Curated annotation (Swiss-Prot):
The keyword Transmembrane helix does not apply. The lineage of its organism: Bacteria, Pseudomonadati, Chlorobiota, Chlorobiia, Chlorobiales. Pathway: Nucleoside biosynthesis; alpha-ribazole biosynthesis; alpha-ribazole from 5,6-dimethylbenzimidazole: step 1/2. It comes from Prosthecochloris aestuarii (strain DSM 271 / SK 413). This is Nicotinate-nucleotide--dimethylbenzimidazole phosphoribosyltransferase. Signal peptide: none annotated.
């Protein structure tokens, strides 16, 4: 499996920057003052470069919501019990979660992916059962996942991206569900981006001050316990991550390897994106960070990455909700690029001075 993984990394290519001049010329020729569509023009530029097509298509969109449980939940770092994870998966399969509403509104299909929920689901049209294990191990006592499990989870995400490409999808989005998953995400940020634990540890599902301090201590313990196994991004992901985070990482790598853009959701999904970036910095050309999460630390994380999220709505739900919203902004940007008239083709005078 390591050979397949390395092949995927080798397949991620930087975008062809030689197209920039032609894309910018088209944007400037649209019937509007130059630059007047602001960031929509930047988004259109990035989408065009990611696809490598001067007339890119955006026919079908899909949100992947990766679900998994976490061994560290036994440490009491969340306001909700672990059984909420499968309950929320059932809610999504019934169409009643926020991500169902927002993905429908965005015209995007939704797949829920069981990467490691501590529950056995029956088959469902919207459920992809890709379970690596029934929940990760407690990272405060040792590695959350084995290296083989980590690679399996990553390659599952890669396969889903490649399958989506073959099915005609042009834009993907990440989402997640997993009680206690802000804890491994925070540990990954601390390790991969060298950020202080206290600065980036938030309240997740709404913990009080006492539990917040306990959560910080658990994350520090996990970093200490696993300190000998944090030399590479893959080791960091295995020791401190989770099955859904590794799946998101794989989806991003897989999409980038076939020139497909991905809209990244919030605090948890960004951890999968950071892991992908650490494994291949070239994936940055294919990423749209959807929104600035209200979870503490996300702004510092975005600043460290030099990323500017599309939206800022104080969201902190996860599931892919922010990504589903931002997908619509990306789609609007592409439509403006493709469908607006140009000064060259329309009977509109350009700027006179």
């Amino acid at each position: 499996m390591i050979e397949q993984f390395q092949q995927v990394l080798a397949s991620v290519k930087s975008v062809d920057m030689s197209l920039t001049k032609e894309v910018q010329a088209h944007l400037d020729d649209l019937t509007k003052p130059r630059g007047s569509l602001g960031r929509l023009e930047e988004i259109a530029m990035k989408y065009v470069l990611a696809t490598g097509s001067l007339r890119p298509e955006l026919r079908k969109k899909k949100v992947f919501c990766f679900a998994a449980d976490h061994g560290v939940a036994v440490e009491g770092v969340s306001a909700f019990p672990a059984e909420v994870t499968p309950q929320m998966v059932y809610n999504m399969l019934a169409g009643g979660a926020a991500i169902n509403v927002l993905s429908r509104h965005a015209g995007a299909d939704l797949d829920v992916v069981d990467m490691g929920v501590h529950h056995d689901f029956v088959e469902h049209p919207s459920l992809r059962i890709c379970k690596v294990r029934h929940g990760s191990s407690n990272m405060a006592e040792g590695p959350a996942m084995t290296m083989d499990e980590t690679l399996q989870a990553i390659m599952t995400g890669v396969s889903l991206a490649h399958e989506a490409r073959k099915e005609g999808y042009d834009l993907l989005a990440t989402g997640e569900m997993g009680i206690a998953n802000t804890t491994p995400a925070t540990a990954l940020y601390a390790s991969m981006l060298d950020l202080p634990v206290e600065m980036i540890t938030g309240r997740g599902t709404g913990i009080d001050d006492a539990v917040l301090q306990h959560k910080i201590s658990v994350i520090k313990r996990a970093l200490d316990v696993n300190s000998a196994s944090l030399s590479t991004p893959l080791e960091q992901l295995a020791a401190l991550g989770g099955f859904e985070i590794a799946g998101i990482c794989g989806l991003i790598l897989g999409a980038a390897s076939v020139g497909m853009p991905v809209v990244v959701d919030g605090f948890i999904s960004s951890a999968g994106a950071v892991a992908a970036l650490k494994l291949s910095c070239r994936v940055s050309d294919y990423l749209f960070f959807s929104h600035l999460s209200n979870e503490q630390g996300h702004k510092a994380i975005m600043n460290r990455l030099g990323a500017r999220p599309i939206l800022d709505l104080d969201l902190r739900l996860g599931e892919g909700t922010g990504a589903a919203l931002a997908m619509q902004v990306v789609e609007a940007s592409v439509k403006l690029y493709n469908e607006m008239a140009t000064f060259s083709s329309a009977s509109v005078s350009g700027k006179s001075v």
